[in-house]
Amino acid sequence: MVLATTLPDTTWTPSVGLVVILSNLFAIALGRYAIQSRGKGPGLPIALPALFEGFGLPELLATTSFGHLLAAGVVSVGLQYAGAL
């Protein structure tokens, strides 16, 4: 309850969207090298570059979920609280 009253309310702006996109790209790049057993689940329905060989649906869901959590922390706790957004 205390945390909800101390953090400022975040409104959606294009700069917030850019932070979310950059956080997701960072998480995908990090997941590309951090996930040890890739390609165990279903693949993506689109062709990917050779750099992402074995990067399927479970890996995409895991990395974008982490990217959204990372973005929520960066936006609400970091940039919004500092007044940058």
Curated annotation (Swiss-Prot):
Give a Pfam family name.
PSI_PSAK
Annotated Gene Ontology cellular components are: photosystem I; plasma membrane-derived thylakoid membrane
Q: Which residues form the propeptide?
A: 1-5
Alphabetical list of InterPro entries matching this protein: PSI_centre_PsaK_sf (IPR035982), PSI_PsaG/PsaK (IPR000549), PSI_PsaK (IPR017492), PSI_PsaK_bact (IPR037101)
PROSITE patterns associated with the record? PHOTOSYSTEM_I_PSAGK
Q: Which domain of life is it from?
A: Bacteria
Gene Ontology biological process:
photosynthesis
Swiss-Prot/TrEMBL keywords: Membrane, Photosynthesis, Photosystem I, Thylakoid, Transmembrane, Transmembrane helix
Q: What residues form the membrane-spanning segments?
A: 13-31, 69-85
List localization entries: Cellular thylakoid membrane
> What is the topology of this protein in the membrane according to its UniProt annotation?
Multi-pass membrane protein
Sequence similarity:
Belongs to the PsaG/PsaK family.
Name of protein: Photosystem I reaction center subunit PsaK
Q: Which organism is this entry from?
A: Thermostichus vulcanus (Synechococcus vulcanus)
Q: Which gene specifies this protein's sequence?
A: psaK
